[in-house]
Amino acid sequence: MANSGNYGKRPFRGDESDEKKEADDDENIFPFFSARSQYDMRAMVSALTQVIGNQSSSHDNNQHQPVVYNQQDPNPPAPPTQDQGLLRKRHYRGVRQRPWGKWAAEIRDPQKAARVWLGTFETAEAAALAYDNAALKFKGSKAKLNFPERAQLASNTSTTTGPPNYYSSNNQIYYSNPQTNPQTIPYFNQYYYNQYLHQGGNSNDALSYSLAGGETGGSMYNHQTLSTTNSSSSGGSSRQQDDEQDYARYLRFGDSSPPNSGF
């Protein structure tokens, strides 16, 4: 009967209580560290996620933020003044444009206090060159020219020795020393020269005008025979009629110089 109470039970071993105690201690310790580590891990992940999110949003803002330029730039771009200067028309001394488009040139004779009609031209540059040649004849080195560089070139050429007595530049003929050959002075506008003589001009002046490129272009003439040469040789009858009509307009409307004519 004494053994009936212990039937079906294992006999108790002394070392079994120690193993159970260690297992219970392990169950109490490891769950504590596991929960703490999971909390720390979640905190670290949350912190890293927040940091990465802030960096990403800051980068996106920098990309989408428009670039603002300083309007008070100390070195602003210079305005294009060269093109504006080319658009402005240059005014030449002794030249004015006719209502029908041609360019007229005239000069005031300082000795006679009268204006000398130089003719009409297709371009303003040709008319300005005619004025320069006449101004050099009347006033010499004191003349105010439209193209002073041409006069300087002619002066430099006159100091050279040897033939020829004239040179050509841009289809314009200039005599370096007219006194060496007074019989062949170029004058391409016979009609206006005759009118000048008819009004009391001095034939000895032998106006040496180079009007190449003008309306009444021609070849060189001897100044001694200009007054007797047929007018048809200077450009044809139709061209002379145009010259006569234009000169008649000059006599009718050209009694007073226009403003800024520079005569």
Curated annotation (Swiss-Prot):
A motif (Destruction-box D2) lies at residues 150-153. GO terms for cellular component: nucleus. Residues 227-238 have a biased composition (Low complexity). Keywords: Activator, DNA-binding, Ethylene signaling pathway, Nucleus, Transcription, Transcription regulation. Induction: Up-regulated by brassinosteroid, but not regulated by ethylene. The keyword Amino-acid biosynthesis does not apply. Residues 12-23, 240-249 have a biased composition (Basic and acidic residues). PROSITE patterns: AP2_ERF (PS51032). GO terms for molecular function: DNA binding; DNA-binding transcription factor activity. This is Ethylene-responsive transcription factor ERF115. One of its GO terms (biological process) is ethylene-activated signaling pathway. It comes from the Eukaryota. Acts as a transcriptional activator of the phytosulfokine PSK5 peptide hormone. Binds to the GCC-box pathogenesis-related promoter element. Rate-limiting factor of quiescent center cell division active when surrounding stem cells are damaged. Is a proteolytic target of APC/C-FZR1 complex. Cleaved by the APC/C-FZR1 complex. Restricted to dividing quiescent center cells. Residues 54-73 have a biased composition (Polar residues). It is found in: Nucleus. A motif (Destruction-box D1) lies at residues 115-118. Residues 1-29, 54-88, 220-263 are annotated as: Disordered. CDD domains: AP2 (cd00018).
